[in-house]
Structures are given as C-alpha cells and as structure tokens.
From Swiss-Prot:
It comes from Physcomitrium patens (Spreading-leaved earth moss). This is Large ribosomal subunit protein uL2c. SUPFAM superfamilies: Nucleic acid-binding proteins, Translation proteins SH3-like domain. Pfam families: Ribosomal_L2, Ribosomal_L2_C. GO terms for molecular function: RNA binding; rRNA binding; structural constituent of ribosome; transferase activity. It is found in: Plastid, Chloroplast. Residues 229-246 have a biased composition (Basic and acidic residues). The keyword Transport does not apply.
Amino acid sequence: MTIRLYKAYTPGTRNRSVLGFKELVKTNPQKKLTFWQHNKQGRNNRGVITSRFRGGGHKRLYRQIDFRRNKKNISGKITTIEYDPNRTANICLVHYEDGEKRYILHPRGLKVGDTIISSNEAPILIGNALPLTNMPLGTAIHNIEITPGKGGQLVKSAGAVAKLIAKEGQLATLRLPSGEVRLVSQNSLATIGQIGNVDANNKTIGKAGAKRWLGKRPRVRGVVMNPIDHPHGGGEGRAPIGREKPLTPWGRTALGKRTRKIKKYSNPLILRRRKNG
C-alpha cells in the first residue's frame, strides 16, 4: 500500500502522511457482519479509569472477523478488500461456495477474484489455512492459534509475519515478529502468508488532532503533575523526580521491571524471550 504525502499548507499538514487506498474496494461493509460496540473510554463497569489517556475518537462499526477459519473443505472467493477502522490490517470479504460470507484478515499479495480454502490438506498458497503439522519448514504464516480450535491469537497486525522453524513431537517452533521463539501445538491452525498493509507503521501522524480522531488523549508526564497525582510530581519549577528510580503512578517500579508472572503456564513454551526496547 502506498503512502500519500501532504503539502505544507499548514503546520499540521507539514510532514503529515497517510496511507493510500488504491487497492481497496469502495463499498459499504456487510450489515450482517457488523455491529455497534459501545466505546468504554478506558473505564470499567464501575466507571473507574482502568486504561489512561483514552476517550473520544470517531464512531466505529465493529467488523466481525473470522479468526477461527473453521469453514473446512469449502473454497471461497475474495470479492472485496476493505478498510477496517478497528485494526491496522485491512480485511477482505470471502464468498464461500455454500453462500456464506465472512471477513478475514487480508494477506499480502491476495487480490480480488483469488480463491482460498481452509483444510487439513490445503495447498501451500497465500490465504489458505491449515494445521502447522502439514506445513513445510520455513513457511511464512500469520493468525496462529495458541489453543487448537480457539481461533487465531498470534500475529494479527498489519505487516506481521511469523516463521515455522522446527517441528518435533506434538509441538512446532515459531519465530514471532517480536523476536520471541516459542512452541505451539502442531494441531494449531495458521494462515499462509504475511498480513498486508505493510506500510502502516511508516505513516506520520503530523498533528495532535489526528491522534484524537483515533480516540487517544494526551499522555501527561508524571513529573509535571501534582504530588497527589503521581510519585514524580511536585517541586518548584522543573524539578527532578526526587526518587531513587522511576515509579508508576501507583508507586511500583517502572522502566525495566519485568511484569510477566513468574508461574505463567506458557513459560516452559517460550524458548527465547522477545527483544526488549
């Protein structure tokens, strides 16, 4: 996908760039596959902020995506490639031979008119879904299940791709985009290819208002707050944090403190941790 640059008519458009939509099909989303989702604004059921700096943003209709790919042995045809405001990746509409329609994540290189299938014996072609046990080593994959039958949970953002590097016993070894190397059941389903919209991270927001359109509010530094609001707050003028090391707003160690649970069930399955920073 191309990147469209703005001319510097205003300070907001100077250096601003957005993604082009040439490969997308101009169409309305399928009504049966969309529904209204209430915007929580970062609050829980009691109205307490649980995720800071969220709120506002443009209204969105949620598109129901088929992450399970459980439509077995029935081929489908790609009819549209559409924009999805709820994720960085684009989506495509699949018309199956039995008349059903579903949205899936758009793999890079898949075009309107192409045919895909989900099957245990599916050919190794872009967009096809099959278990890891039937894939050759070195295959590029995305939308990978952690628990077989639960639906894809790994590698689902724009431009993401994982690699199948080994198979032994009941487990397959994957190299994830983060650099993490982990084990997954060979019965887990995955989709062939890399997710499209690879230039999603290369665009420049350009102005604060564009962040507000996305529902993201200003991220305030703790050092400019009052002492009641943050451990770093207070002091006269530009004061240091006054602590031995940085802390979170709730007084816990920040910046470098590992937050992963020591007894998490998947620890034995991770052979190499992801890169930090």
